[in-house]
């Protein structure tokens, strides 16, 4: 399991005085980018091919930060399925998501397999 703290910014809040629903995708992306950077030990080159998000609770600017948790569910040849959660610092689940990403070669514009080193680190993340 991987976790990252993400700041709640003033611009994230909408007229209803809570974090706008679209911003949760940004929080998840920030956590996922940090996770991929650690796993790939470099620039995280991936594309999101499927994203399912459930919004569970409000987050307000006064919360200051949220915790993004990434758990690996399935590792394919080029794809990775993760369970991603946005939690308040008090531990309340604000959003949860299931995300499928594909390792991407930007030069050729197509999926590429994970390297052996990446697979080893991802397998470790699956088995914990």
Model regions and ranges:
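Terminal targeting signals and extreme-terminal segments of soluble enzymes
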Residues: 1-67, 73-128
